[in-house]
Regions:
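N-lobe entry segment of adenylate-forming
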Residues: 1-63, 67, 91
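A generic secondary-structure signal
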Residues: 18, 59-63, 109, 113, ...
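Carrier-protein-dependent adenylate-forming modules in NRPS/ANL systems
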Residues: 30-32, 36, 91-93, 97, ...
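Conserved AMP-binding/adenylate-forming
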Residues: 40, 57-105
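Conserved ATP-dependent adenylate/AMP-binding module captured primarily in the ANL superfamily
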Residues: 85, 100-131
Length: 132
């Protein structure tokens, strides 16, 4: 029965990498610039965005993020939230994408349960993170 399914496990980085390799010149157009990826501008390609994801992953690694670490991504709802999760996945870290609507008390619960994770945030959620 399993031979009927062409299944590949979901891995955010591997899936993005494969898309970038197969279709590097396919355009990606944004309606606004992405704060966490300003170099992408309003228009990029899979290939170019893949390189920016790697740069961000290397920056996260330089901050100490490594395999198995949890990273709460708690920021405004933009496409860069997903790209940050892909960068974390490259390092074999575990991205935890959390809605920016949640109060700091909920984030405190995440921090406790995830055993002191990294938190990526932006100006929209900075005040709530300071309260954690």
């Amino acid at each position: 029965m399993t031979h009927l399914l062409d299944y590949q496990p979901l891995n955010l980085y591997t899936n993005y990498q494969e898309a970038a390799e197969k279709t590097p010149t396919v355009p990606i157009i944004f309606d606004e610039s992405l704060p966490a990826f300003p170099a992408l501008g309003l228009e990029t390609t899979y290939g170019e965005s893949h390189q920016e994801i790697l740069k961000r992953a290397y920056q996260l690694a330089a901050l100490g993020v490594k395999k198995g670490d949890k990273i709460i991504i708690y920021k405004s709802p933009k496409f860069d939230t997903y790209l940050l999760a892909v960068a974390a996945s490259y390092l074999a870290a575990v991205p935890v994408m959390v809605s920016y609507h949640l109060p700091f008390e909920t984030i405190e619960v995440f921090v406790d349960r995830l055993e002191d994770p990294y938190i990526l945030f932006d100006d929209v959620t900075a005040e709530k993170v300071q309260a954690v």
